[in-house]
Amino acid sequence: MMMTDLPENIRKTAVALLRLGEATAEDIAKITGRKRSTESYYLNLMADLKLVKKKKVGRKIYFIFNSRDQEKRQ
């Protein structure tokens, strides 16, 4: 799946994650201006599609693009 295939609302989340590299839903929300819960929902949808992976550190969950997907975009 290409970035352009994503709906606009999820694409905004994806672009923010690309800028940050690795981020929590709260980090993404600061960039997009949307609620943390909204970003969490979109990030989890992207995880379900195997576009991003989750990394739990303590109580925080960080999201990062899968390496294979990142290579396709470059």
UniProtKB/Swiss-Prot annotation:
Keywords: Signal. The keyword Signal applies. Residues 1-25 form the signal peptide. Gene3D superfamilies: Winged helix-like DNA-binding domain superfamily/Winged helix DNA-binding domain. GO terms for molecular function: DNA-binding transcription factor activity. InterPro entries: HTH_ArsR_DNA-bd_dom, Tscrpt_reg_TrmB_N, WH-like_DNA-bd_sf, WH_DNA-bd_sf. This is Uncharacterized protein AF_0529. It comes from Archaeoglobus fulgidus (strain ATCC 49558 / DSM 4304 / JCM 9628 / NBRC 100126 / VC-16).
